[in-house]
Each structure stands twice: as structure tokens, then as C-alpha cells.
Amino acid sequence: MSSGSTIVSSDKSGRTFKHEEELPKLPLPKLCDTLQRLKESLEPLYYADGYYQHPLDPEQIEKLSSIIRDFEENPVSEKLQSKLQSYHDTRDCYLDELHLDINNQTSTREIQDDVLPRNPFLVLADDALPNITQADRSAVLVHSAARFISALKQDLLPPDINATNGKPLSMAPFLNLFGTTRSPVFQRGEVENFDLNKPYTASDLEDPDYSSDEDDNDEPTQKDFDDRKRKHEEDIFTGNGITIKRHPDSKHILIISRGQYYTLEVLDSTNKIIYTAAELTTIFNHIIKDSSGIEKSTALGSLTSHSFRNWKYARKRLQKRYPNELHRIDSALFVLVLDESQEETTNDGDDTADISQMFNRTITERDKKCTSANCKRVFYGTSIINSKGHQVGSCVSRWYDKLQLVVTADAKATVIWDSFTCDGSVVLRFTSEIYTESVLRLARDVNAGDPQFSLWPNVTQMDPETKKLMTATISADGGGPSEIDPKLVVNKIDWSFSNILNTHVHLSETKLADLISKYDIVRASIPLGRRSAQRLGVKPDSMVQVALQIAHYALYGRMVFGLEPVSTRGFKNSRSSFINIQSQALLELCQLFISSSIDGTDKLDKFIQTCETHNNMVKHAKSGVGYEKHFNALKYLFKFHDHFGIHLSGDESSAAKDLFENPLVLPFSQPELIVANCGNAATTTFGITPAVPHGFGIGYIIKDDQVDLTVTSQFRQGDRLMFMLSWVLGEIRSYWRMSRGTSHNKTGVKISPVVDKLYEMDNAVNNPPKRNGHTVNGSRKTSSSSQVNLNRYGGFFDLEGHIDSRNISKTPSMKNLQKTFNGLTMSADNDHSSSAVSVPTEKEKLNTGHEILQIQPREVASNGLEADDETDIEIVAGNADGTSSSASSATSLNSKKRNVINSRFDIDFDRSRVGRKVATLDQ
């Protein structure tokens, strides 16, 4: 989900889905390759006891190898692979026929009540206007979102293009973004036969037999047995099923404020925008006021955060009792949440402000806690209990089954999405473009509403006269412009819950409050980013992923199974795939990194090699032959082999069960680390939730000079993990500096012997005697071999600078850049005290030449580090004999042209324009 993986086509006239048919099929990997990569991903987890360079456990590894080998040699593997091959030959994607959108409980087990909703979130940057209100920010973003949706529905949205190879990406995932919802799969008659008067019991969550309302005294017939068998088979296939419901004709949004539910039409029948941003502000202010006057709110949204079985039971009851209301929610384009929470601050008074200047570290820690608290409130809201014991926090104002846009009372905006229905790269584009459109509104305002200042200039508003008939009322004076009456255009959903449903809602709310109390979100920024990775010669994503594994190993002394999502939208009907982060090479690096068995240079080399291995894994997955989807498809076919018409013998079933249900393979379906990269300049924070209660969910955004990370965990040391990550990356940088410093005196760069000789000759003939820093006229020593200055760093040509120029150099500091340029600019002075010195003759030019300013190499300290790695280059005046004077003396009154090389050749050019090689930013 990297932010740099896609670009938007500049062809504004292009149709949104014009490339879909030309996309290639997702390849079907070879069975042997998938099993081999599965084995390699699991091996680093099983090693002998001990902390220092412990070897792999031979007994565990042999068991793992044996079960994989037995499965591969058994006919069951060929039967399952053949079924996938038949789907691959006859479908656009071999995964299409597997109904994975109905049953997604194969890749990860259902965790009972102990994990947060698996919804990633992106926090948007602040609005371009300071001190904007909640209603105004909501109106601007909703108006931008409506324009985005209108462009998509009218086929005006430019298609995505791969930034690396220029190939088109699938736009099909955009169809799952709006007007869709996550929903449990119900069997035939399950909702219709549900008894609303039946009290809620725990058995409702476990009993799959939904014919309990039948008369138990009736003697069952053969037909009853057949029906029950068929229902049982259906329940095996769909009992834990989750599917996606689509409503492509949706025109309205759902608004939640203080637990109250409202709907608002935003598109007309031709997908034109109904309201302006100003009109939306009026509507949202009305909703905020209306919801604030109601003391009792409903925590209905907390039902979407409950475990699968509780969620399914609640949806079934709501669908039976409130079918129309639930349909209005499910079919909404997206959800706007008007969160009433405010940002926490660190200032408790003037005393604290004074303390902050004296104790920066203490305040920094407090700021860090406040930043983490703000991440919590924009994600799952606040949990506040009033004097009556009722939940009045904003955590009840969420709906995790759908795409959500959350805007807090202090105008902080966040996009939260369901990872089952929505793709992360698609959400990132939506988030980025609605933010960009919100900024472009300022350009439209100062250009008389010019539509060219928009990402979608062809998207238009509804005709004013038509809108007047639909929504507006005449102002009080009868002659003024029409105004929107919010009461006429906003529809409020009224609930009248029974005691049974009230009980279930209450239990779901208390469970959610417990989860909020259990989980911690830590946000940290580490000052190494894209430029640092470029200097190392590695990909930024690989640098962060590998360093995180080292940090985890240094903290806990063991390797864990971790997954990273990789986009596969370059293929038909494909979204993403997971790759395993851990490998044998990474395990060896972790063991060596925390030891003293090798020096820093070798650790750096090993780190770079491991980053390259990780990058190759990413490329492999992007090519469509990743093993994660393939292995899950094989596992899914075996689980429902009867449904798919695959007949297996007892021996075949046993061989498959030994692999798919083996505890050694269990970490594959229960990853302890989920680490993902998603974000760009329009976002400030990206967070994901862990897959298991004891795991970490780590989201990060890579910037030029820093990495912003968000760690979500339950009873874990997220802040300490970030401390270890900072330490690891700091060590890597110090190793790089040390390696760079010691390489100054190495002949790692090949220079032509002829060029070397010319440098020596040029230095040899330029050692005239000096007096007070100036060449004495008419006096010149005869050069000889004993007088040749062979110091390659002491001559007037600095070879070290040329060697450095072949390496990627540090980006110059911007702090003193102007000062440096001013120092390099030479000015001629007309006050000459000696014509022999200030105005040399042509003969003198040939004999002695002119002096130039030299850019001397930075000194390397005894510890191998650069003496001043973060400051600008020091400017000194260099003479032919290797002596130097300060930059101030170099600009003395007796100098004529100080930018002429001290050579027998008269060469005049601006030396300040010559610098070291600058690192490019193309990563």
C-alpha cells in the first residue's frame, strides 16, 4: 500500500475502466514453489533455546519438512491444484470461483471478543484555512467526496497507472468503496423465521440450528432429515460467512452525531452535486445542534465492533425489526461522523509553559502521550461514563461496516475503512484527492469559481431552479434568495428498541469500552526517511521493515511471523497479497546485529543485503506469484471439498489435514506482526489494528527525512518497540558514517593513470615560494622529483573531492546555504597595492597562475565519524604548496580574481557552481 506505487493518469478525457479488459490474469503459482516458500517463511520461527546465535531446531524443522513433503507427494495436492487450474483457465481470476467474498475465515481465525475492529485509518492533514469549524471542515470534505463519487459514477475519474512501469491498474476496487457494506451471510429463511420475542441467550451465538421454533413433539420424517443435512452442509459453507452488499444506485450519505442517525441526499438522478459547501455547512450545523439537545443516545454502532457471532445475531435482529432503517444505513455512499471530542493539550497553566522551557524531555513525553491519545479519539472515539453510569463518549458514534469520514469538534479529519470490502491503495487515492480538492477550493474562490481549478472540472452542480423545487424555501422577506431548510432535506432515523435489543446493544458497548481500555496506540516519528535509505542504497520500505524486525528481536529475543500487504492491482479482479517479512537471512541479521561478533561495517553490509532480499520478495509478490493467496485457496478448497465436488479418500484427507491444521503452520494464519505502509503528503498518520490479541499492528508513512509510525497493541510495549527501532536505525546510520569515513583513504574509485599523472605534473610545476600568502614575482623553484608534492589531498586539485563526487553525498544543509553561496562569490577590488601581485603579466600567469578557493574535505575524526556531518562545507583558501588561510583572509584587498585555478593555464570560471554529486530522489 505504498504511496508511491500508483500515479493518476494525466489523460483527463480517459474513461475510468477503459483498461480493465486488457489487464493480464493473476498467475497461478506452482504448487512446489508455494510449499517451498511456506516452509522458508516458517523455519525462522523454530530454533533451539538460547539468545545468542541459536541454531534452528532440527526436530521442529524436520517435522515441518515432513508434513509439507507428505502433502506434496499425496494425490490430494494434485486434486486441489487441478481444481484451481480449471478455474484459472476459465475465469478472469482463479480466485473468483472460490467465493472467498462469502467465507473469509480461512486466512485468520475468528478471535473471540479480544481484538479491535479490523479497520485501518488515515488522518488527514489540517485544512488550509486556520481555525476552521467542524461544520465547515465537514462541508468542504463532503463536497469534495461528492465530486469524487460523481466523477466515478459518470466514468470521468482518470484511471490509476503504475508509477514504475507505466502499466494500468485495475479500477474495479473503486466499485466497493461507496454504497457498500460488510454483511454476514444468512441462510434461507433465517431472518424471516427469527423470533423477535425470544429472549437473548448465549446459545443464540452458538446454535446453528435455526429450526428450533418447530414443534419438538413432531416425529421427524426422511424429508426432515434430508433438509437438516442440506442445511448443515450449507451452514458449514456459509455459517461463518461474510459477504459484501453493493448498492450502485446510492445517492445519500449517513451522518452520525452523538449517537443520532441522519441521512442526506447529495447526488441527483444524473449524479450531479446537489448542495454547495456553504449549504452543507448550514445542514451540518443543524444536525450538530439537534443531536446536542438529546440527552439519550444510542450505542447502536458498537454492534459493528463486536465479535462475528454477536455481530451476526444483532444484524439479524435489526434486519427483522428495522429492515427499512438498516437498508438506509447499508446503502449509504459513506458515513460522516461528527465527533464531539476535542484535542487534548499539555498546558495546564502558565507554570507548565514555564516548565516546558526548562524540562524539554518531560514535556516531550507528555506531548507524545497526548499525540497517542488524539490518535485514539479520531480512530475509535472517546469512552466517557457520566454520573448515571451511561456511556456518553464518542465511541458510540462509529459504524465499522462501512467507509467512514470522521471530523472532530476541533476539525481533525480521519478516514476509516473496512479492510474486507475496501482496498488500501484505493482509499489512499480517495483520501488524497478529497484533501487536494478541498485546497483547490481556495483557488476557485479567487478565480470566480473557475472549474479548471478542480481535479474533476467536468463535474457540475445541479441546476439551481431544479434544486429550488426539490430542497429550498423562500427567505422570510419573500424576495431574497432561496435558502436551504435543513429540516426539509435531512431525514432522521428514529429507533424504538425493545428490551432485548437494548440489552444486546448495552453489552456490545461495554465490550467496546473494554477494548478501548485494553488497547494502546503509540505514535512516533523517527528522523530517518527516504533520503537516508537512498544514501544506504536500499528501498525505504525495506529499510523500515527490516529494522522493525531487528528491533522486535532485540526486545524479545525471538522471531515472529509478520505479514506486509502488497498491491496486486496490476491484474484482473485482484487487490492485494501478503508477503512474509521474516526469512532465514533476516534471522541471521537479527542475531548478528545485537552481538559483537562482527564490526559495524559488516553489520551494515548484512543489513543492506537483507533489505535487498526483502525488496525482491515485494517484487515477486507484485508480479502475481505470491504464495499467500495460493496457499489460502488450497486450504479453502480442502475445507469445502464436498461443496466444490472434490472427492477425497481417508488417506488424502489425513495428509491435507496434517498440513492445514498443523500447529507448526498455525502462525501463518495468526500473524503476530502486521506492518503496512500507506500515506502521502495529504495524510499525517496511518494506523492498523493487530490480527491477534497479543500482536502488533504497525502502520507507517515514509517522508523525505522521517518516518511516522503508529503502533497499536494490547498490553504491549509499543513505545519501547519504537525506542528500539530508533536505536536500530541510529546504529545503521552510524555504521554508514563510519564506513564512509574509512573509505576516504581507499582507492575504491578507479582513476585513469594518465589523469593521475597529469595531476602530479600540474602539482609539481606549481610550488613557488610564498611570502605572506602571495607568490613572489620572478622567483620560482625548478621542479624535481624530490620537490613534487605527491600528497593527493595537498595539491591544488583535491582528488578526495573527486572521489567523493562519485559517491552519493549528504544533502547540503539548508540552514546556512545562503551564507555558503555568499562566501563563494568573489568580488574584484580596485585598491591594488602592488601591480606585480594584483595585475600579473602574461608571463607571470604562465609561470605562477592564480589562486583559487578550495572546498576542502571534511575532517574525519579518530572514531571514524565525520567531524561535522550536519554543518555546511568549510571554505578555505588553498595555495599551491598546500598551505591555507581562512575564508576571511582569502577576500583580502590584494586579490584580483580569486576564482582562477592556480595553474599555468589561464582559466576563468565560477568555482562556486562546481559541487559534489547530489543524490537523486527517484526511489
Swiss-Prot record:
Listed InterPro entries: Carn_acyl_trans (IPR000542), Carn_acyl_trans_N (IPR042572), CAT-like_dom_sf (IPR023213), Cho/carn_acyl_trans (IPR039551), Cho/carn_acyl_trans_2 (IPR042231)
Polar residues composition bias: residue spans? 1-11, 774-787
List the catalysed reactions.
(R)-carnitine + acetyl-CoA = O-acetyl-(R)-carnitine + CoA
Q: Where does CoA bind?
A: 529-541, 567
Region Disordered: which residues? 1-21, 197-232, 763-787
Q: Which UniProt keywords apply?
A: Acetylation, Acyltransferase, Cytoplasm, Fatty acid metabolism, Lipid metabolism, Phosphoprotein, Transferase, Transport
Q: Where is the composition biased (Basic and acidic residues)?
A: 12-21, 220-232
| Enzyme Commission code | 2.3.1.7
**Could you provide one GO biological process annotation from this protein's UniProt record?**
fatty acid metabolic process
Modified positions (Phosphoserine) are 783
Q: Which residues carry this modification: N-acetylserine?
A: 2
Q: Which family does it belong to?
A: Belongs to the carnitine/choline acetyltransferase family.
Could you identify this protein by its name?
Carnitine O-acetyltransferase YAT2
